[in-house]
Amino acid sequence: MNYKTPTKAIITDAGFASRYLPITKTIPKAMLPLGNRPIMQLVVEECVDAGIEEIIIVATPEGRKIYDDYFHDECEKIEALLTKQGKVERFEPVKKVLNFPKITVIEQDQSLPYGNGSPVASAREFINDDEAFIVAYSDDVVFGASAVKDLIEAHKAHPDAMAIIAAQEMPHEEMNKYGAISLKDESAMTLKDIIEKSDDAPSDLASYGRYLLTPEVFKYLDPKNIGKDGELWTVDAITRIAETGNVYVEKTKGTWMTTGDPKNYFLSHLKYVKEFEDYYKDIKKFVAEN
């Protein structure tokens, strides 16, 4: 079966981000800022730039309220105050957020086991049986190009795909930090397996949190299929699909960085400032002088 090209994306932020405590006791990790935009907004914008029409954000019960407020509250009092002060142009970034395509925020199904596959499974009712869809982990940001757009273009080239996963080449000596891709057919770029954090990586291609999936994945995102550490893993489901169907690997054009821990969050923030803010030169000067 050939599935329809994606128009929907599931973005996940349903964990508790214990490496960021105490701040994530109150604020979802993907609401931490890069410049004046939260990480989640950058992931949403990547999807919007690729033509995605509907986004489902999967959050914790506490995070759901915060994401609903951020993407849906019209903040009329703030706009009125800025208008009165003659600073209404400062409200333009808020209007941009409010004008995004349809965004629905849901809670992760609490009956599912822990693991990054459970937020995806929680959004099953939003996905039609005949359509492919995007899954994006909000831990990951992509600079310079939309990985979501790359995946959608790859789907047009491979309508037989049961899934397509994003990949980035990394230095070989660092591959023990990532999920290393093993290819079934190098010329066709089809997946055999993903080997997590191994000192004997089968390639220098690292898998990261951008996937084009089909409803086939829900057959395997089931509590009876828990894997390492008793968790439900999206990667496990994808490799099960690869056993009988074509899962393609797409080397994306942008630069992927993770925000999954404080160190890499800081590096991602620095990359953001370098790319988007004119005060980067002041930061370079400060670092040089101190």
Regions found by a protein language model. Give the residues of each.
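Short catalytic helix/loop segments, enriched in acidic residues and glycine
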Residues: 26-41
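Active-site acidic Asp-centered loop
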Residues: 136-138
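Conserved N-terminal catalytic core of the sugar/cofactor nucleotidyltransferase
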Residues: 1-11, 19, 37-131, 143
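Catalytic-core segments of class I nucleotidyltransferases/pyrophosphorylases
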Residues: 134, 148, 152, 156, ...
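Active-site metal-binding loops of divalent metal-dependent hydrolases
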Residues: 16, 140, 262
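Conserved donor-nucleotide/metal-binding helix-loop-beta segment in metal-dependent transferases, i.e.
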Residues: 141-174
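Conserved beta-strand termini and adjacent loop/short-helix elements that scaffold enzyme active sites
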Residues: 106-110, 122, 166, 197, ...
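Nucleotide-activated chemistry modules centered on ATP-dependent adenylation/adenylyltransferase
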Residues: 173-177, 181, 210, 214-215
